[in-house]
Amino acid sequence: MLLCVLKIYIIFCLVNDGAGKRSEVRGRTKTYSHNSRGYFRKERGMGKNKILLVNTKGFDQPHIGQGSFGLVAELFDSTRTDTSRKEPDINKVKLFSTAAHANKSSRNIGIFRRKAFNGSRRNIFSRQPFNKRNTDVTEKPGAKMFWNNFLVKMNGAPQNTSHGGKPQEIMKEACKTLPFTQNIVHENCDRMVIQNNLCFGKCISLHVPNQQDRRNTCAHCLPSKFTLNHLALNCTGSNNVVKVVMMVEECACEAHKNNYHQTAQFNMDASTTLHN
């Protein structure tokens, strides 16, 4: 009889011990974070404001603290009932790792730098379009083309035939008046130095071959406005020497339709000096 009572007592104790363990397991409230490196779990028997940090990476002994994690969470109430096994999403603790965030930022910076380097390298080594217009040498109509067209015109071509030269290029003349220092010299006389002007430039000339009257039209840069001055030189002797000098004021291109052209005579020597 005593043996039966002892067996019943042992069975009753075992049943109560298993039921207590199951209720303790059900009473625990677990909260997991969305981070794969760890989660937080709140124990019912640990107090009101204590959080148990469980490291899921190594599954070592749990420790209480914050570690290297930044936590923004709302603590659960310790007086929660055992009937609520499922927890709503609003009570879950969101956890992020500062180290993982730093690694992600460094990876993003590295990707941005690689993209920028590749873009700059493409800009440097990109093929530039070949511009054929810049390589071609532009040939302007010169004297040869003008002469050939002129010969065609003079050999029986119609009167309205146009030549290849441009009027701006054909009629381009340059006749300038340049100042210089002129020396008047004579034998047994002192040298006289005066300030005068000379004519320098490019004018149009025209020669028509195979013509009976041999008409030539030439234009020369000649004085268009001048004065004649008589200069008396200081000489050693009884004879007085007077020189007639053309004092040039303006120059222009003048055409002559003769076989010869008139040139102006200047009393100049090798020591003549031009002034710019």
From Swiss-Prot:
It is found in: Secreted. Disulfide bonds join C175-C221, C189-C235, C199-C251, C203-C253. Belongs to the DAN family. The keyword Nucleotidyltransferase does not apply. Residues 1-20 form the signal peptide. Keywords: Developmental protein, Differentiation, Disulfide bond, Glycoprotein, Neurogenesis, Secreted, Signal, Wnt signaling pathway. The lineage of its organism: Eukaryota, Metazoa, Chordata, Craniata, Vertebrata. Inhibits wnt, nodal/nr-1 and bmp signaling in the embryo to promote head formation and anterior neural induction. Within the endoderm, acts as an essential mediator of nodal/nr-1-induced cardiogenesis in the overlying mesoderm. The long chain interacts with nodal/nr-1, bmp4 and wnt8, thereby inhibiting their function. The short chain interacts with nodal/nr-1 but not bmp4 or wnt8. Expressed in the anterior endomesoderm of the early gastrula with expression expanded laterally around the margin at the endoderm/mesoderm boundary. One of its GO terms (biological process) is negative regulation of Wnt signaling pathway. Its main location: secreted. It comes from Xenopus tropicalis (Western clawed frog). This is Cerberus. InterPro entries: Cerberus, Cys_knot_C, Cystine-knot_cytokine, DAN.
